[in-house]
Amino acid sequence: MILLIIEVREVSREEKLRTIISTIDNSEYSNNKDNNIQHNCKMKTFKDPQETWLSSTFSKMKYADYKPFQFVDGEGVRCSIYLSGCLFACKECFNESIQNFNAGSPYTMELEDKIIEDLGNSYVQGLTLLGGEPFLNTQVAIQLVERVRKEFGDKKDIWVYSGYTYEQLLKSSEDKKKLLSLCDVLVDGPFMIFLK
């Protein structure tokens, strides 16, 4: 008789994502010149996040939607803004229609004033930035978040949903680092339907 002992341990979300991300075939975005090979990867990746995907290059300073008084984009009642444009192109993305940087409407001071007014309600816990990719729209995101901090200090929390990982953002451009430093919660990493 053989006794098999299996150690069971909890795996953190970060460990799961690292394992999953390391098994994704990203070769179609590498220097592979063989176009006859079929690839399953739908997520675009990059070698140097600081020098390739810059907000100043891609952002059109547009937003796709603003939804006040939401319950699904973080804890408590939230005001959520969906910024236009994303280069990750995650497979089965919920917001595929706003991956285009030209989607939606120009961000205006009138919209910003409305967001600040809505956040002023005592029952609203905070602001959520989604997309698209907020870190590819830092001109808009930083302006809005700095205004929220000026008006409310730390009384309203700020959440950001991003296809970037925390580690990538730490090595990224200065504008991305600044936005990261202004936020309270980062929900990071590419969207993967099987983790839902």
What spans do the regions from the language model cover?
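Classical nucleotidyltransferase
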Residues: C183-K196
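N-terminal [4Fe-4S]-dependent radical SAM core
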Residues: I2-V8, L17-S22, C41-Y82, N95-F101
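Flexible, glycine-rich phosphate/dinucleotide-binding loops
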Residues: V72, E167, L195
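Low-complexity, intrinsically disordered or signal/transmembrane-proximal segments
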Residues: Y29, Q38-H39
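Cysteine-centered iron-sulfur cluster-binding motifs in ferredoxin-type domains/subunits
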Residues: R78-C93, E133
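Acidic, Ala/Val/Gly-enriched low-complexity intrinsically disordered segments
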Residues: E7-E15, D25-E28, D34
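Conserved Radical SAM active-site core
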Residues: W53-A64, V77, N95-V160, Y164-K176
